Swiss-Prot record:
Belongs to the DUP/COS family. It comes from Saccharomyces cerevisiae (strain ATCC 204508 / S288c). Keywords: Membrane, Transmembrane, Transmembrane helix. It comes from the Eukaryota. This is Putative uncharacterized protein YIR043C. The keyword Protein transport does not apply. The keyword Protein biosynthesis does not apply. Its main location: membrane. It is found in: Membrane. Pfam families: DUP (PF00674). The chain crosses the membrane at residues 93-115. It is a single-pass membrane protein. GO terms for cellular component: membrane.
Length: 230
């Protein structure tokens, strides 16, 4: 665990979740004033990063007019999901052992039943789901996502589709994802924002599967205000 992550998990999140001054004093005692001073410095730096990131360092995709969402390439979302799970190398192994097990006369019924189940779980180890990505994504990538939502000009379903295209390109270029198919469509992108950003802000409760993104709360609120008009 890095220094910043330790600061976030031991001070920033626990302190920010306290409802009032009495609760803070009860938990942190005489350290409250020092923690508040440290958080003030930290939030000032975050604000500087956001302003710089959202203006001078603003990322703009090239050739996005030719980009397609996975929903345009796959007939069903299930096909897209299965492609992630059944990678070519995994599928070859699965078919090879499937052939051995089911053509052998010495294999009992239980083994034949358990084999596909075990192989499925082995293959799904490589499947990077949304929740795990949120845990590993850098703060700058989260800022880019929120900035993309805030600055989107399109409205309605088209707006979310455009955001999904831009983020698919961005996550691929930054090597966060191995292709431009992270988001299936605009609805997938909207769900991602709702689940891992706005919902956590509303609950203000620590979740095992994602960071609370306390530093980003002001920008999440701004993005949500834009979302209501999309």
């Amino acid at each position: 665990m890095g220094c910043q992550e330790a600061f976030r998990t031991t001070l920033l999140e626990p302190f920010s979740l306290k409802k009032d001054e009495a609760a803070k004093v009860k938990s942190f005692k005489d350290s409250v004033s020092y923690i508040e001073e440290a958080l003030g410095v930290y939030f000032t730096e975050v604000e500087k990063q956001w302003k710089l990131f959202n203006t001078e360092k603003s990322w703009s995709p090239v050739g996005l007019e030719d980009a397609k969402l996975p929903k345009e390439a796959y007939r069903f979302k299930l096909t897209w999901i299965l492609k992630r799970i059944f990678k070519l190398r995994c599928l070859q192994v699965f078919l090879y052992y499937f052939l051995i097990v089911y053509t052998s006369g010495n294999v009992d019924l239980i083994s034949r039943f358990l084999f596909p189940v075990v192989m499925f779980f082995i293959m799904t180890r490589d499947f990077q789901n949304m929740g795990m990505i949120v845990l590993s994504v850098k703060m700058e990538h989260k800022m880019q996502f929120l900035s993309t939502i805030i600055n989107e000009q399109e409205s309605g379903a088209n707006g979310w589709d455009e955001i999904a295209k831009k983020m698919n390109r961005y996550l691929f270029e930054k090597k966060v994802w191995n292709n431009e198919e992270f988001f299936y469509d605009g609805l997938d992108c909207e769900w991602f924002f709702s689940c891992f950003f706005y919902r956590l802000l509303s609950l203000k409760k620590t979740m095992w599967f994602a960071s609370l993104n306390v530093e980003l709360w002001p920008y999440v609120k701004e993005a949500q205000s834009v979302v209501t008009s999309l």
